[in-house]
């Protein structure tokens, strides 16, 4: 995320995007919680993760579950499929802070909370609250800030539960149309709500939003529905119509097909982010807020989780 803390430079700088990473996950491989077992007739998600960092990672940053300053996790528990994305606020770089470490630690804490015996999979906002509390109450907490979007699909009622704070977000696609889409939470243009652990002596200098401020929603799902979580590197560069065009081109919903579709989305978003003449969603929003921006895409890290709702064959 190229954004401000409370002091934001007027113009954004462009960076080359040179590195791609990918991850695929068929739900169930990470199932570790022992408290109950899944029914063989329960719905499940076929999930893939794809992303690009806007520039090559520096030595020592090549950890899993990061695309630049973005992070993510995918977990499968007996009660729910769980996923999340987080976008570290890039303004921390000016203070010599790894802007992506906070996002990674936040996602790791949320992922760990899903393995507790009392996790029921129906309140991702409570999951975000618990994950942030774990992170912020460490003896030596990681300094930084991040947006967050969490989603769970509960197996028993095939319902998607979401919690979104900031300008990452989610989509539910059914029969080629967007059925549900999250709404951004921002303080100002390019200044999203963000969870923050500030330095002890400078708390007044940062936006410190609460995880309780995350917007929660629930949506009934059907087999064949697509669920997409992404950071703003996707949404700021790719119009919804273009995203749908790629997703609707999927011939099947297997792991390989989803990965191919996710890769096409990420690559197209990356291409648009470097196009100085393209009227991107970000450029349009800048004009609407009377912000000086030359137009074109917004170079940024891009993280995408794409899932298809499936039911076992009888």
From Swiss-Prot:
Q: Tell me the residue numbers annotated for binding Mn(2+) 1.
A: 87-88
Q: Which reaction does it catalyse?
A: O-phospho-L-seryl-[protein] + H2O = L-seryl-[protein] + phosphate; O-phospho-L-threonyl-[protein] + H2O = L-threonyl-[protein] + phosphate
Q: Which CDD domains match?
A: PP2Cc
The protein's matches in InterPro entries, at most eight in alphabetical order, are given as:
PPM-type-like_dom_sf, PPM-type_phosphatase-like_dom, PPTC7
PROSITE patterns, per this entry? Answer: PPM_2
Tell me which residues bind Mn(2+) 2: 87, 232
One Pfam family of this chain: SpoIIE
The protein's name is Protein phosphatase PTC7 homolog fig
State the species of origin: Drosophila sechellia
Q: What is the lineage of its organism?
A: Eukaryota, Metazoa, Ecdysozoa, Arthropoda, Hexapoda
Q: Which gene encodes it?
A: fig
